[in-house]
Amino acid sequence: MGKFMKPGKVVLVLAGRYSGRKAVIVKNIDDGTSDRPYSHALVAGIDRYPRKVTAAMGKKKIAKRSKIKSFVKVYNYNHLMPTRYSVDIPLDKTVVNKDVFRDPALKRKARREAKVKFEEKYKTGKNKWFFQKLRF
């Protein structure tokens, strides 16, 4: 079977606090490491989706409704469901990596980086499906 968990692939989180949220793989580790002896992936995802926007709304209201809250986390492959979609969101690998979990300040910085990049991509109007809440 081919390796399909690749960076840029959209996944659904199945377990934990962010279950039901969409995320994108930043880095995948198929063979595991010494501290995590199972296949896992570093993902960046959307915790709070942007709200619906209509043409009748003003600029300030649209700006307020277009905010996104993100998360950065390492997940076991068992807790991720891959989709057929992939998005091209160029997250800065120096800011968003596995070392951020050692220091809360670095984690905040990584979350901020993901938030900024997600909002940029959202404003272009591409990948609409990724920025909509999964109805279940």
Curated annotation (Swiss-Prot):
A Pfam family per the record: KOW
Keyword Ribonucleoprotein listed: yes
Modified residues (N6-acetyllysine): K27, K93
Taxonomic source organism: Canis lupus familiaris
Single GO molecular function: structural constituent of ribosome
Function: Component of the large ribosomal subunit. Required for proper rRNA processing and maturation of 28S and 5.8S rRNAs.
CDD domains: KOW_RPL27
One GO CC term, this protein: cytosolic large ribosomal subunit
KOW domain sequence ranges: 5-40
Gene name of the record: RPL27
Record note on quaternary structure: Component of the large ribosomal subunit. Interacts with RRP1B. Component of the large ribosomal subunit. Interacts with RRP1B. Interacts with DHX33.
Cited PROSITE patterns: RIBOSOMAL_L27E
Protein family: Belongs to the eukaryotic ribosomal protein eL27 family.
Claim: Cytoplasm is one of the keywords in the record: yes
GO biological process, one term: rRNA processing
Record keywords, A-Z: Acetylation, Cytoplasm, Endoplasmic reticulum, Ribonucleoprotein, Ribosomal protein
Protein's cellular compartments: Cytoplasm, Cytosol; Cytoplasm; Rough endoplasmic reticulum
Protein's name in the database: Large ribosomal subunit protein eL27
Broad class of where this protein is predominantly found: cytoplasm
